[in-house]
Amino acid sequence: MPKKSRKLLPIYYPIETMARELDARILFSLISSNRGRSVFIGHKSDIARYLIKGSAPSGFYIHKSIAEKQKNRFQKIKSSGHRVLVNDEEGLVYPSANYYNQSRVSKESMKNVEIFFCWGKKHASDVLPIFEGYEKKIVIAGHPRFDLLRSPYIGLIGGGKSRNKFKILVNTNFALYNPDKGRAVKILGREMQEGYNYKKMMARLFKEMIHKISDEFPLCDLVVRPHPSEDIGYWVREVGNLENLSVRREGSAIYELSSTDILIHNGCTTGIEARFMGVEVLSYEPLQPNKWNSGLPHLVSRSVETLDQVIESIRLKKEAELESCQEINEVIKFYIENASGDLSIHRMLQAIEGLENSREKVIAVPWFNKILRLAKKKVSLIRNPGVIPRSEYSLKKCPHLKLEQIEEKLSQYCSRDKDLKMPDVSEPWPRCFRINSIRENV
């Protein structure tokens, strides 16, 4: 009689910012389901609550950061029978290793983490000093967001440039100075204060640049896309009255880029995505010397320091006279492991499979803990039969998902990759969706 295959533990992969993360989570879930593993997605607060109160079966929980404030959350999730992994959404772009390690990394939080996925060799080399003793937990995997820009999935995005008007996209990244309303920003230390002052000055200079571009190119489409953590109202007030301009940030940045001719940014991940897609990229750097605009977004961009250089670069691009930047594939590969070779999703799943097969790290939840979890679940349902409302700021970054929305995106990715089968989707708890393993569909 053939041996029955072992059921794989599910993965919980929460979302904080829908425009940034949803498509990558969908593709991750689709590939995972085809490898025999179910994935739960939903807003991070909903997912964490279900895990901590014992509603969810034991599995792998992937969080977006490993900051000090996550220590207690990780401990609670681990105590509920789950295994904690981290894939930092902000691990690609940061001013310096010192700044990153002070603001986003905690060795105390790492104690309850079993894998810390790094974007590339650069990211890994920056965190290794602070994670001394935990080197085996570090896995260089890249990030699923850049799998979206690889064949065959990039085909879902392209084809948007068959327009009559030349499109200029300006991405802003000044949340430290211009945070969304109701969200406090703590300024800790001299380096962060310097960063605040820099972002404040750059926001003013970007405003002047946007007005200048609008005046010089009145027949072009000009779009300003603020960072998800910024107050979009600031840009509506400052530049929203310009006739040829719109301020928006709906959907993923890569869809906006598909119809863009030239992108202008300052230290933004979108600059890297644009380069992957063949879009001309300008990094506006009027403040020199500038330690705040280092890293890959700067390296993949054409640096311009004056308004005249910005205007001239746009004019040359419109007239098809702007020379392409030199190839920098090796530089990109140093920062983003999945720029070539295996997809990040396959690298992550392989590491998870290895962890699951590792006997010394298998979590055995005592029988009395299981009974306690069931009791907590029943008490929770009695005390709180509904769902906890989320803040206005949280809803701006991640509106409530719908099952049909997930199914539509899954179908789109299946249409691009004929090797993938369409999984079933369910909503086991309010606002939490399960993309079922293909094995469970048959």
Walk through the language-model features, giving the residues of each.
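Donor nucleotide-activated moiety binding/catalytic core segment of transferases
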Residues: V223-I272, F276-M277
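Hydrophobic/aromatic beta-strand patches that form the interior of the parallel beta-sheet core
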Residues: F40, I62, L85, I115-F117, ...
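Catalytic binding pocket for nucleotide-activated donors in carbohydrate/polymer assembly enzymes
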Residues: G240-L242, T269-S340
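C-terminal amphipathic helix plus adjacent low-complexity
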Residues: E312-V442
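Short, charged, surface-exposed secondary-structure boundary motifs
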Residues: L51-I52, K71-R73, Y94-Y99, L148-Y153, ...
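Active-site and donor-binding regions of nucleotide-sugar-utilizing enzymes
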Residues: P2-K3, K7-G158, N171-N173, Y177, ...
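Conserved catalytic-core segment of nucleotide-activated headgroup transferases in glycan assembly
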Residues: P152-E238
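Soluble or luminal CAZymes and related metallo-dependent hydrolases
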Residues: A24, W119, Y198-F206, S340-S344
